[in-house]
Regions:
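Alpha-helix boundary/capping residues
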Residues: 10, 96, 133-134
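Generic, well-ordered alpha-helical scaffold segments in large soluble proteins
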Residues: 6, 80-85, 126-129, 133
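Compositionally biased, intrinsically disordered low-complexity regions
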Residues: 11, 58, 141-143
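Acidic, glycine-enriched catalytic cores built around paired aspartates
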Residues: 101-175
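C-terminal catalytic subdomain
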Residues: 18-113, 117
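Broad hydrophobic/π-residue packing in well-ordered secondary structure
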Residues: 1, 21-32, 39, 47, ...
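Single conserved hydrophobic/aromatic residue that forms the stacking wall/gate
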Residues: 1-9, 13-14
């Protein structure tokens, strides 16, 4: 149950664990970071991974949430992820089948047929989803939730106003 809601709640946790513009470049950069919401056992393309453990070694069982950004605020990220897990236990949410396929190698149609949804591609997309989340607002509290959203919207606006060296090199000669 915990894993099931952690998977469902993972989309909300992404907003707290991947809270910077560059976080999404890592998720969608093709560097073995998860880009889709799914789970598996020994599948490194899965967002949630539950590695197999040896018989009699049940204490070594673990769940890996593979989208956590190294610069995330651990208090926010773990609060939402743990709350999602507890919510799954309370609601006795059922977990679908594990994904053994390399999700990056599947076509969009194959992923869609399997019910595998993409993670947000940008901070802006993540914020739009988070704004609709009563779950995250309840976990963080309205005050912290509002402050977080305001802060991240400001950061996104500042980012969008920047002209990067890439843009200058790519487009200036075409003027």
């Amino acid at each position: 149950y915990e894993i099931s809601c952690s998977l469902v709640g993972s989309e909300m946790c992404i907003r707290d664990s991947d809270q910077y513009v560059n976080s999404y470049k890592r998720l969608w950069g093709g560097n073995e970071a998860p880009s889709y919401i799914c789970w598996g056992h020994n599948n490194r393309s899965a967002l949630l991974r539950i590695p197999q453990y040896k018989p009699g070694k049940g204490n070594s069982a673990r769940m890996e949430f593979r989208a956590l950004d190294p610069v995330a605020n651990p208090y926010l990220a773990y609060s939402v992820l743990l709350a999602a897990g507890l919510d799954g236990i309370d609601k006795q949410m059922q977990l679908g089948e594990p994904t053994s396929d390399d999700v990056w190698e599947l076509t969009d149609g194959e992923r869609q047929a399997m019910g595998i949804q993409p993670l947000p591609r940008s901070l802006d997309e993540a914020l739009k989803i988070m704004e609709k989340s009563d779950f995250v607002a309840d976990v963080l509290g309205e005050h912290a939730f509002g402050y977080f959203l305001d802060n991240k919207h400001q950061e996104w606006e500042e980012y969008n106003q920047q002209v990067t060296p890439y843009e200058l090199k790519k487009y200036l000669p075409k003027l």
